[in-house]
């Protein structure tokens, strides 16, 4: 059991036959009243993010999540195929569970799958990912007022705003949490 007073980012727990991961927890106590905890949580089965409220001292059942490192192999229509680095076993995961992550997955990318018992919940990808720009329009002269940006397309098909100096063929770093440009990558 996990005391809700100890909630912090990344803690996983079970409630109402669902598995949740804490994204953010806010603890508050008012005067003589009892403490309360508001937690922003992600349902690991559906991907839905909700806010749950608890009375200080409540307990929830801990969910023991296993993480396994795998490589992304390919997209097979309705599913993606991953391979276990240790056993070379291949598994398929429905794309509906990894819709956002698909924007950043390139062949051979290292990911972690999260398993509960024998059920695969979702995948975790690195926070910052290097991707190659495949389409970048030329910068327009005179378009240089406050923080000029242009829309580029990366190798996964994802489109994002970048500074004007980014050119086709360059490697850029993209945040997998926000989908925003973070900087130039290692252009070899």
Swiss-Prot record:
Pathway: Protein biosynthesis; polypeptide chain elongation. CDD domains: S1_EF-P_repeat_1 (cd04470), S1_EF-P_repeat_2 (cd05794). GO terms for biological process: peptide biosynthetic process. It is found in: Cytoplasm. It comes from the Bacteria. Keywords: Cytoplasm, Elongation factor, Protein biosynthesis. SUPFAM superfamilies: Nucleic acid-binding proteins, Translation proteins SH3-like domain. The keyword Cytoplasm applies. One of its GO terms (cellular component) is cytoplasm. Involved in peptide bond synthesis. Stimulates efficient translation and peptide-bond synthesis on native or reconstituted 70S ribosomes in vitro. Probably functions indirectly by altering the affinity of the ribosome for aminoacyl-tRNA, thus increasing their reactivity as acceptors for peptidyl transferase. PANTHER family: ELONGATION FACTOR P, ELONGATION FACTOR P (EF-P) FAMILY PROTEIN. This is Elongation factor P.
């Amino acid at each position: 059991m996990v005391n809700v007073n100890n909630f912090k980012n990344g803690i996983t727990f079970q409630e109402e036959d669902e598995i949740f991961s804490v994204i953010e927890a806010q603890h508050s106590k008012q005067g003589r009243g009892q403490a309360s905890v508001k937690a922003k949580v992600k349902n690991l089965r559906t991907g839905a993010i909700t806010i749950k409220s608890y009375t200080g001292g409540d307990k929830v059942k801990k969910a023991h999540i296993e993480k396994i490192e795998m490589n992304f192999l390919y997209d097979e229509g309705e599913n993606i195929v991953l391979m276990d680095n240790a056993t070379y076993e291949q598994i398929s995961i429905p794309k509906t569970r990894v819709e956002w992550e698909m924007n950043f997955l390139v062949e051979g990318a290292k990911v972690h799958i999260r398993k509960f018992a024998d059920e695969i919940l979702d995948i975790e990808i690195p926070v910052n990912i290097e991707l190659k720009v495949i389409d970048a329009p030329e910068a327009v002269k005179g378009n240089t007022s406050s923080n000029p940006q242009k829309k580029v397309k990366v190798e996964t098909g994802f489109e994002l705003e970048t500074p004007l100096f980014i050119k086709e063929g360059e490697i850029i770093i993209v945040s997998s949490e926000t989908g925003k440009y973070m900087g130039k990558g290692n252009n070899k």
